[in-house]
C-alpha cells in the first residue's frame, strides 16, 4: 500500500521509510544524519551531511544557545515555501544521538525550516530501498562544498534551490551571566594576546603590551608596521569561511608565538573582528603547548572574551587537531576525565558526552614544513 507524502504544513512530522525515499527523490531536500555510526545513506544529487558535534557545541545546542545562521538568500525565501528546501532528519540510535537530533529539530523549528523526521530504523529504510545505500562507506564524512552536490551521479541534475548554509554555522556566545565583553587586546597568557584590526594598527597599544610579533590572519589587512625592524609579522591568508583550512598553518603559527615567548616579548594574533580566525589560531596554540582539550582551551579563552564566535568549520578543524594531538584518542564518546597538564588550562575539564567529529572535511595533515622566522615579514598564501 502506497503511503501518501506528508503535507509540508505538518512541520516536524515523522515519516515512513517509503515517504523518506519519495521525498528524497522528488523534492528539494537537505538530509541531516544525527547518528554517530551505522549504515550510510546515498548522497546522490542531494546535499547530505553527517551532523556530529563535540561536547562543547552539543551542550550549547541542547541548551538553546546555539543558533543556525543561514545565507541571506535562504532568509529571503522563508515566506516562499515552494522555493525553500526541506530537511530530512535521521535521528540517532543512542540516547546521546537522540538528544542531539531532538535539539536540532527544535532549532530547525525555531528557524522556520520545514523538516521531517525518519520514524523507522535506517536498516528498514535501506532494506526496502537498497539504492539509497552509499556504495562508498569510507567517504562517510562529507566534504562540504556549497556550489556543487557531493556524490552527484553522472547525468543527474542537482537541485538548484538554496541550501542550509552549514559553512556559516557559527558557535555563538551563550549567556555569560552579564559578563561584559572584553576590550582588545585580550590577554590569554603573559605573551599571547588576541586582537582585531584596530588593535593591530595601534602602535601605542602594541608598545604598551610589549608586542613585537604579530600574526595577521587575513588575506587583505596590511601589516601596518612591517617596515619597523623591531616588528615581526606572520601572515596567514585566510577568509572566514569553509574554503580555508587553518590546520596546516598551526605549526608555523605556534613556532612564531613561541619565538616571541623566548625573546621575552609578546605576540598579537588578529583577524578583522577578533572572534573567529584569530581565535582558532589561539586555541590551537593552547591545545598544543598546554596539551589541553578543545573544550578546556575554548572555555579558557571565552572567560577572557565572551564575544568569541569561531565558525563551525574552524571548530571542526580544531576537533581534528585535538585527535591528532592524541588528547581524546583513549576515549569513545567522552572527553578525557583528567584535568589538563597545565594549570593555565585547568578549566572544568570534566568528562562530557559528545558525538563523534564535527561538520568538517576529512582531517588535514599538519605536516607543513617549518620556515625560518628571521626576517620581519612572512606570508602564507
UniProtKB/Swiss-Prot annotation:
Annotated catalysed reactions: O-phospho-L-tyrosyl-[protein] + H2O = L-tyrosyl-[protein] + phosphate; O-phospho-L-seryl-[protein] + H2O = L-seryl-[protein] + phosphate; O-phospho-L-threonyl-[protein] + H2O = L-threonyl-[protein] + phosphate
Entry's Gene Ontology molecular function annotations: MAP kinase tyrosine phosphatase activity; MAP kinase tyrosine/serine/threonine phosphatase activity; protein serine/threonine phosphatase activity; protein tyrosine/threonine phosphatase activity
Expression tissues: Expressed in vulva cell precursors. Expression is increased in P5.p and P7.p and their descendants during vulva induction. Expressed in syncytium hyp7. Expressed in germline cells.
Keyword Transcription found: no
Compartments where found: Cell membrane
Catalytic residues in the record: 271
A GO biological process held by the record: vulval cell fate specification
Entry GO terms, CC: cytoplasm; cytosol; plasma membrane
Impact after mutating residue 310 to L: In zh32; at the restrictive temperature of 25 degrees Celsius, 87 percent of mutants have endomitotic oocytes
Bias-annotated ranges (Polar residues): 365-381
Notes on the domains: The KIM (kinase interacting motif) region may be involved in the binding to MAP kinases.
Sequence similarity: Belongs to the protein-tyrosine phosphatase family. Non-receptor class dual specificity subfamily.
Alphabetical list of PANTHER family matching this protein: DUAL SPECIFICITY PROTEIN PHOSPHATASE, DUAL SPECIFICITY PROTEIN PHOSPHATASE MPK3
Identification of the protein by name: Dual specificity protein phosphatase lip-1
Lineage: Eukaryota, Metazoa, Ecdysozoa, Nematoda, Chromadorea
Gene name, Swiss-Prot/TrEMBL: lip-1
